[in-house]
């Protein structure tokens, strides 16, 4: 499976998990979706299933936080270096305690399925 994970700007220094572990958690969740023969990804929303798996894993890791996960899906079929004509902007704001709460952003590409997932995870200390 050809996947690339790219970490984007975010405030993850106070994360309940180390940054590398967050990436692994997301990658494993995505891979388990792709490997599960009982899930029909043509009829089920990949992003909704991915959010569910990620949140379940985060909740198992620490119950001291509330978690929010967001996935934006881009279909990148037909895009190449000469024809990369799309623009996407996403802003998010929150009111929180910066020493305990934070945000992590990353990009997950599945070139086999011509999709790109822009994933944001927020954690709020209870």
UniProtKB/Swiss-Prot annotation:
It comes from the Eukaryota. It comes from Saccharomyces cerevisiae (strain ATCC 204508 / S288c) (Baker's yeast). The keyword Transmembrane helix does not apply. Disruption phenotype: Leads to cell death when overexpressing the camptothecin mimetic TOP1-T(722)A mutant. InterPro entries: Tctex-1-like_sf. The gene is TDA2. One of its GO terms (cellular component) is cytoplasm. It is found in: Cytoplasm; Cell projection. GO terms for biological process: negative regulation of actin filament polymerization; negative regulation of barbed-end actin filament capping. This is Topoisomerase I damage affected protein 2. The modification N-acetylserine is found at residue 2. Present with 799 molecules/cell in log phase SD medium. Signal peptide: none annotated.
């Amino acid at each position: 499976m050809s996947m690339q994970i790219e970490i984007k700007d975010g405030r993850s220094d106070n994360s309940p998990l180390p940054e590398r572990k967050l990436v692994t958690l997301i990658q494993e969740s995505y891979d388990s979706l792709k490997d599960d023969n009982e899930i029909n990804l043509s009829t089920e929303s990949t992003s909704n299933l991915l959010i569910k798996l990620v949140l379940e894993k985060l909740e198992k890791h620490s119950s001291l936080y509330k978690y929010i996960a967001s996935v934006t899906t881009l279909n990148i079929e037909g895009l190449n270096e000469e024809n990369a004509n799309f623009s996407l902007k996403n802003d998010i704001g929150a009111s929180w305690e910066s020493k305990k709460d934070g945000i992590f952003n990353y990009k997950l590409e599945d070139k086999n399925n011509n999709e790109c997932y822009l994933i944001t995870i927020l954690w709020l200390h209870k």
